[in-house]
Amino acid sequence: MLTGKEIREKYLRFFEQRGHQILPSASLIPHNDPSILWTAAGMVPFKPFFTGQAVPEYQRVTTCQKCIRTPDIESVGRTARHHTFFEMLGNFSFGDYFKESIIPWAWEFITKELNLPKEKLWITIYQDDDEAFEIWNKVVGIPSERIVRLGKDTNFWEIGVGPCGPCSEIYVDLGEARGCGSPECQVGCDCDRFLEIWNLVFIQFFRDEEGNYSPLENKGIDTGMGLERVASVLQGVASNFDTDIFREIMDFTANLAGQEYGQKADIDLALKVIADHCRAVTFAVSDGALPGNEGRGYVIRRLLRRAVRFGRVLGVREPFLYKVAQAVIKQMQDAYPELKQKAEHVLRVIRTEEERFLETLAAGSDILSALINEAKASGASEITGDDAFKLYDTFGFPLELTQEIAEEQGLAVDVEVFNAAMEEQRKRARSARQETEYLSERGVLYKALREELGETRFIGYSALEADSNIMALLKDGMQEISAVAGEEVEIVLDVTPCYAESGGQVADHAILRGPDLEVEITSVNKPVEGLVIHRGKVLSGIIKRHDSVKAIVDQPRRQDTARNHSATHLLHKALKEVLGDHVNQAGSLVEPDRLRFDFTHYAAVTSEELRRIEEIVNEAVLSNLSIEVFETSLSKAKEMGAAALFGEKYGKQVRVVKMGDFSMELCGGTHLTSTAEVGLFKIFNETSVGAGLRRIEAVTGTGVLKYLKAKEEQLEEIASVIKSPMHELVRRSEALVQQNKSLEQEIEALRNKLAKSEVQDILGNIKRAKEVPVLASVVAAPDMDNLRGMVDMLRDKMGSGVILLGSTAGEKVNLVAAVTKDLHGQGLHAGNLVKEIAKMVGGGGGGRPDMAQAGGKNPEKLQEAIDQVCRVVEGQIK
């Protein structure tokens, strides 16, 4: 029996012997292809070669490609074949061999290398592919009755925009016992009898965004054999999950949870889902993906959270997925060395995300359980969309998870109302942004101006001044002939040296100067591609449409901005060196006085890491690296290794910014000519801006001197306040902290003493409600912790009874209630009691039957509310 590892090796060696270069798997994150989230097939990394956009180094290639597909996440574990992560064995020809070679090779491999019985093999071809039929029938010798012609839905391969073509599939007949029993059952039937193990795609066409097909200049071959699927056939098991590829991970998980595979259906399902999802997450994170709320980050988060949920089915309540990930790494690291290299990072990301979700799960699950119980008690058949949205919006509880848990309890979720609530939230967000967005009418005007005037010519990379003509003049969104001093205007020039805000870099400031007129420009942007709008104020004279002016950029401001932009590139590279290759730019702001850089990372950057990042940037600055800026083709830039932003749309020609051998990125911003011009680099803030996202803020050049001067002044002020010389600040501060700690301990001891005294005093105020001891009082407790402590002391002394204490803190009311366990059977519930009393002081709250707390905002009504406690208790006693 061949193992998964042996099948992988046998396949690659077979094609290596036939002139193919073995290449390592490409990343799961597609390189410079924003049209897809994941590498979902073996040919994805080779699309440019099939389309002619790039020239391959090798004409024949074979790979075992890591793949992720997520359309059917819910089916994972419930069927024999569905996976989110899988390995695709493939061989490729870029304008070299075609059908005449791959078809005989495929037959040779499966019948001689894998020793599959010929009588169990069937072939499908595209209905119009007579060429493939002839090769299978005449050259290979497959009887015509075992070659099945099928339509485009099954035998024409395409994944949206890109290379495509007819395909031929090889099927294995697994026997009548696996079939549907129909006498008409044959290849193409939806049952499990005929299993497709290899797809041979004949790349002949390119499909565009409109769905049109055009012949490719270079025909090619793309084949795909699912490793997990063929392993199930060769190992004689009914499910991919029963192959050695999965069983090793599933057995590890079962042992971890104290469970056994093959005994209970729900346990088996959980083990399968966890194994699948953990494989996907482990590989994705090793390739640079991080959990998040959008795009591939959302996919990773969803898979992790589903796996955690299924861990609870196994009885696991603590973080465990990182341990399963260790098993995945151990099993797969020989074939994929990057797993071992990134192991520490992968395990840390998974554990951090799992711990965060367990906190979310604890809070959300309790509320969802209550909602489910309420729905069942009222005879409802679903959880309301509003409740599902509240769980999502308040606790981060995913809709999919709410649906799964509700479904287990026989309930649905009103997704329509949930979606409506989501859309309403989006509308509110859009409304909040309207003040900074252009009105739709103005957008129409800009588009018309672009069509009428053509493109604004930008010369600002090489010049800071330009003789220009005013092509259009706008005031308040309307075209005007002229404007006078004091008026705010928008101006379109035929040529401009002004950089328009884009790519995170702020716009230039400038002066437009003409005979007897001057306009101050404080904003430049491109509301429509190709049209540059200059916004500013007329300082003197009268400006008219068609006037000739000289546009003069504020050179010091431009230089300061360029200094920070170049430093941003150095920072990006330094972050990757210190934190790892998973770091990617997620946003930036480049201004004259500072820079802000958002990036993907799973944890706060430590002080030591920040120091090292600063050192690396300043070393690059002091190295006086030459900064080269040049234009080239996108394909050439990729070959050179220039970094690009995922999701950014690039044209065929791109602008590359290269800083010695240290950094190379695609960038349209303005830059220095040497890194030495950065002067100095200093990070002044690092913080979180979302799950898996961090932000660094920094200054450069004279900004560093200003920053250090401000810090020095702060230290001088602190020294003055605590009456200490500068050189003794640390020692004096430590002494003050210790003194403060001692005083706090003394205060706490006094508070406890006072609390005990007050507790003793109010014990004489016990009343009875239907023979139940009730103690209710207003006390002097500075905060909720002290109030709870007093309630605990009273409960210990009373032994049996109901206690409710209230205190004020400024304009707030604090309430704590307790009910001893012997009274729970009489209908008394601390949460219900405190909730009722809290209403009387304008607040709310609740909690457990034995202890609960609440707050209010009407301290003047506290005594009145306390006086009602006995009455409320009487009403609750059964």
UniProtKB/Swiss-Prot annotation:
Gene3D superfamilies: 2.40.30.130, 3.10.310.40, 3.30.54.20, 6.10.250.550, Bira Bifunctional Protein, Domain 2, Threonyl-trna Synthetase, Chain A, domain 2. It comes from Desulforamulus reducens (strain ATCC BAA-1160 / DSM 100696 / MI-1) (Desulfotomaculum reducens). GO terms for molecular function: alanine-tRNA ligase activity; aminoacyl-tRNA deacylase activity; ATP binding; catalytic activity, acting on a protein; transferase activity; tRNA binding; zinc ion binding. Catalyzes the attachment of alanine to tRNA(Ala) in a two-step reaction: alanine is first activated by ATP to form Ala-AMP and then transferred to the acceptor end of tRNA(Ala). Also edits incorrectly charged Ser-tRNA(Ala) and Gly-tRNA(Ala) via its editing domain. It is found in: Cytoplasm. HAMAP family: Ala_tRNA_synth_B (MF_00036_B). Belongs to the class-II aminoacyl-tRNA synthetase family. It catalyses: tRNA(Ala) + L-alanine + ATP = L-alanyl-tRNA(Ala) + AMP + diphosphate. Signal peptide: none annotated. SMART domains: tRNA_SAD (SM00863). Binds 1 zinc ion per subunit. Keywords: Aminoacyl-tRNA synthetase, ATP-binding, Cytoplasm, Ligase, Metal-binding, Nucleotide-binding, Protein biosynthesis, RNA-binding, tRNA-binding, Zinc. GO terms for biological process: alanyl-tRNA aminoacylation. It holds the Pfam family tRNA-synt_2c. Consists of three domains; the N-terminal catalytic domain, the editing domain and the C-terminal C-Ala domain. The editing domain removes incorrectly charged amino acids, while the C-Ala domain, along with tRNA(Ala), serves as a bridge to cooperatively bring together the editing and aminoacylation centers thus stimulating deacylation of misacylated tRNAs. GO terms for cellular component: cytosol. Zn(2+) binds at residues 565, 569, 667, 671. SUPFAM superfamilies: Class II aaRS and biotin synthetases, Putative anticodon-binding domain of alanyl-tRNA synthetase (AlaRS), ThrRS/AlaRS common domain, Translation proteins. This is Alanine--tRNA ligase. It is an enzyme of class 6 (ligase). Its cofactor is Zn(2+). Transmembrane segments: none annotated. Its EC number is 6.1.1.7. It comes from the Bacteria.
